[in-house]
Amino acid sequence: MITDRQLSILNAILEDYVDFGQPVGSKTLIERHNLNVSPATIRNEMKQLEDLNYIEKAHSSSGRSPSQLGFRYYVNRLLEQTSHQKTNKLRRLNQLLVENQYDVSSALTYFADELSNISQYTTLVVHPNHKQDIINNVHLIRANPNLVIMVIVFSSGHVEHVHLASDIPFSNDKLNTISNFVTNKLTEFNQNLQDDIVSFVQSEQEEIFINKLINTMNNHISNQSNSIYMGGKVKLIDALNESNVSSIQPILQYIESNRIAELLQDISSPNINVKIGNEIDDSLSDISIVTSQYHFDETLKGQIAVIGPTAMHYQNVIQLLNRIW
């Protein structure tokens, strides 16, 4: 347990370190924060905080910087303070859906970029799990003799577009007939479906095409549920200073791999969650990940992650994610 004065000093050290990227000394603290105590008192309190492992001494400076434990203490207090706050929720994602004709992938791409521009950090947005949604309609549109565009319409109103190669140039009337058949059978995808297909088709080519359509649709929905949209990738590189350039490559490999998707699934929660440094992975001591949920509606939701250095403006990021519905 630390005293109120030690807490004020810890907050001041942490905020200065985040703002300026340099270890903070007692003289600097007094000048910047108008602390009404002597430098000796500040140094003594800093020594106590160092003994508690909340701050650590820089090798080439007399100043102190926050430790991972110090960041964790600060973040826990922030989360506790904001958990009871009522905020006006932003429904920007719903606007983006309308602007992009309910194309979820396009909307999430713009959403990731917008969040990155607002937060000034790299942002990941995970595609919602459509397995929780219901397919209402399937429309087939012939783009050219050998390409069909499959438009999947979900009960939530969201739309997915899938390209489907075709060995034969089906007429628009035939594609409409196939669309109606598949739509009517959506709730019957079971062991009887293949018999229904055989009874419906008029040629082996039709049977092959419909089976391919169904497999492609199922694979697309499954794959999309794991898709991640990244905004502001370069911001993470810029945020990591020269002292930890060597850590950039493993960090980029991590966020571009399935491991980040697994992490986001593991901490899937309606509440804001913060992972700092080694809490993420032993090789990722230089970054933090702040996660939260976003909603399309009451049932369809996904995960957002904001990624930055451990010296992140946590308060700004938490306030931003707190406003997203």
UniProtKB/Swiss-Prot annotation:
Pfam families found in the cross-reference section: HrcA
Signal sequence interval, chain numbering: none
GO biological process: negative regulation of DNA-templated transcription
Membrane-spanning parts: none
Keywords, ordered alphabetically: Repressor, Stress response, Transcription, Transcription regulation
GO molecular function: DNA binding
Function noted in UniProt: Negative regulator of class I heat shock genes (grpE-dnaK-dnaJ and groELS operons). Prevents heat-shock induction of these operons.
Family statement drawn from the similarity comment of this UniProt entry: Belongs to the HrcA family.
Entry protein name: Heat-inducible transcription repressor HrcA
Organism: Staphylococcus aureus (strain bovine RF122 / ET3-1)
Organism lineage string: Bacteria, Bacillati, Bacillota, Bacilli, Bacillales
